């Protein structure tokens, strides 16, 4: 049985030429923001990758196939679609088998990227250990995927709504390299400094690429997480966000929001509580990660 992979013309041409490729997720399009802002942002992120010298490969499941790179029409269809499944490792195969449509989370995007031979993936922030996980056991599949699938993930750290100390502990237990780019502190998505030190630091895309290649040579499974801090002019201080996150989490608990619905609920409430500031910061950090992702992809191909 052949893999149900469909490459966009742009990605197919890049693969044939050995050009640098950067995978992009699709959950940010379907679950991250409303239309048409989601479409505009997706186009802007792809343009940022191209401007930085690489080829973007936005990944989504459509008609039961893994689409590696989306055409302009496909991107627009996905941006306006309703009821799109949010796919991770557990439900990716089932969606493909039934010929469904789905947006890929960090974990699912990593799987598809690896199958397509793409080694770098730029996203906003990874999932992790949710607050209260000692009772709910709500831990994102993204963490184990980082330990399993050989893709370097460029993100602004883990989402600030999570339990960041526990997230870092789990990543350490799983043997995942956590590398802060250009600073010693582990960033917290909308904020440059979480108050926690990053285990590792790299100051250039070349260093990050070399670490990726060395892991492969050593036969070590999994990828690496590159924590790229949000640009200074776009950050929201952690001290400003902390009480709002507590409020949003309390509301989620009161409403019985659970499992995959938790993150979208919290992000939406924080958007409302900050009068849209979190969304503006989110867009800025994704664009920043796209630029670094392109630089790492270029370094891997030289």
Swiss-Prot record:
Any one Gene Ontology molecular-function term assigned to this protein's record: pseudouridylate synthase activity
Record GO biological process: nucleobase catabolic process
Positions that bind Mn(2+): 138
Cellular component, GO, one term: cytoplasm
Active site: 25, 159
Protein origin, superkingdom: Bacteria
Necessary cofactors: Mn(2+)
InterPro entries registered for this protein in UniProt: Indigdn_synthA-like, PsuG
Catalytic activity entry: D-ribose 5-phosphate + uracil = psi-UMP + H2O
Entry's family note: Belongs to the pseudouridine-5'-phosphate glycosidase family.
Family matches, as HAMAP family: PsiMP_glycosidase (MF_01876)
Protein name (Swiss-Prot/TrEMBL): Pseudouridine-5'-phosphate glycosidase
Gene: psuG
């Amino acid at each position: 049985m052949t893999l149900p992979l469909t490459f966009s013309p742009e990605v197919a041409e890049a693969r044939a030429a050995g050009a640098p490729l950067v995978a992009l997720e699709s959950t940010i399009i379907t679950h991250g923001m409303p239309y048409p802002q989601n479409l505009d942002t997706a186009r802007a992120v792809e343009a940022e990758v191209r401007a930085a010298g690489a080829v973007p490969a936005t990944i989504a499941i459509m008609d039961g196939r893994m689409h590696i790179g989306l055409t302009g029409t496909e991107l627009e269809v996905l941006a306006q679609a309703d009821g799109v499944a949010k796919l991770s490792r557990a439900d990716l195969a089932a969606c493909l088998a039934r010929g469904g449509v789905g947006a890929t989370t960090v974990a699912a995007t990593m799987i598809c990227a690896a199958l397509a031979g793409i080694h770098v993936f730029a996203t906003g922030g990874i999932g992790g250990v949710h607050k209260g996980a000692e009772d709910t056991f709500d831990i994102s599949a993204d963490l184990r995927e980082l330990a399993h699938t050989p893709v370097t993930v460029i993100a602004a750290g883990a989402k600030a709504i999570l339990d960041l100390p526990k997230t870092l502990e789990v990543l350490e237990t799983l043997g995942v390299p956590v590398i802060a780019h250009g600073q010693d502190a582990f960033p917290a998505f909308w904020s440059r400094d979480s108050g926690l030190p990053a285990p590792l630091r790299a100051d250039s895309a070349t260093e990050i690429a070399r670490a990726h290649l060395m892991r492969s040579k050593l036969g070590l499974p999994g990828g690496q997480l590159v924590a790229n801090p949000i640009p200074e002019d776009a950050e929201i201080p952690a001290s400003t966000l902390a009480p709002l996150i507590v409020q949003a989490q309390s509301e989620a608990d009161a409403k019985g929001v659970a499992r995959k619905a938790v993150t979208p609920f919290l992000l939406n409430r924080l958007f409302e509580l900050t009068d849209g500031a979190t969304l503006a910061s989110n867009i800025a950090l994704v664009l920043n990660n796209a630029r670094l992702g392109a630089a790492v992809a270029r370094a891997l191909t030289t």
